[in-house]
Swiss-Prot record:
This is Small ribosomal subunit protein uS13. It holds the Pfam family Ribosomal_S13. The keyword Signal does not apply. NCBIfam families: uS13_bact (TIGR03631). Keywords: Ribonucleoprotein, Ribosomal protein, RNA-binding, rRNA-binding, tRNA-binding. GO terms for cellular component: cytosol; small ribosomal subunit. Belongs to the universal ribosomal protein uS13 family. Part of the 30S ribosomal subunit. Forms a loose heterodimer with protein S19. Forms two bridges to the 50S subunit in the 70S ribosome. GO terms for molecular function: rRNA binding; structural constituent of ribosome; tRNA binding. Located at the top of the head of the 30S subunit, it contacts several helices of the 16S rRNA. In the 70S ribosome it contacts the 23S rRNA (bridge B1a) and protein L5 of the 50S subunit (bridge B1b), connecting the 2 subunits; these bridges are implicated in subunit movement. Contacts the tRNAs in the A and P-sites. GO terms for biological process: translation. The gene is rpsM.
Length: 125
């Protein structure tokens, strides 16, 4: 397995698909990286030469924010929004959907498990 940006990418898949295993790289960015490195997208990772792998590593490390750096940046952005107490920050604090989704009947994933509300107990006559 080739190792790029501290991620083992699968050998038996096409290069453009393998690059999407790296956090922060989607199919569009993967195709863009292949074009910059002048490597065919359809080439399998196991047939890449060492020079091609080095070229890929250099492009990804120098021009893109991926893996730990990107995760850290996202976390810091969320923390900043919480600190300034803007609307999105408040939604994060309350663990509710941030981007305007409905919460009346949906958003179970974000809100957590449903909690039953105790109603009046029926009396037997």
């Amino acid at each position: 397995m080739a190792r790029i940006a501290s991620v083992n990418i699968p050998d038996n898949k096409r290069l453009v698909v393998s690059l999407t295993y790296i956090y922060g790289l989607g199919s569009t960015m993967a195709a863009e990286i292949c074009n910059k490195a002048k490597i065919s997208r359809d080439k399998k990772v196991k047939v890449l030469t060492d020079q091609e792998l080095i070229r890929l590593r250099n492009i990804i490390e120098n021009e893109y924010k991926v893996e730990g750096d990107l995760r850290r940046e996202v976390t810091l952005n969320i923390k900043k929004k919480k600190d300034i107490r803007c609307y999105q920050g408040l939604r994060h604090i309350r663990k509710l959907p941030v981007r305007g989704q409905n919460t009346h009947s949906n958003a179970r994933t974000r809100k957590g498990k449903a909690i039953a509300i105790a109603g009046k107990k029926k009396t037997v006559k």
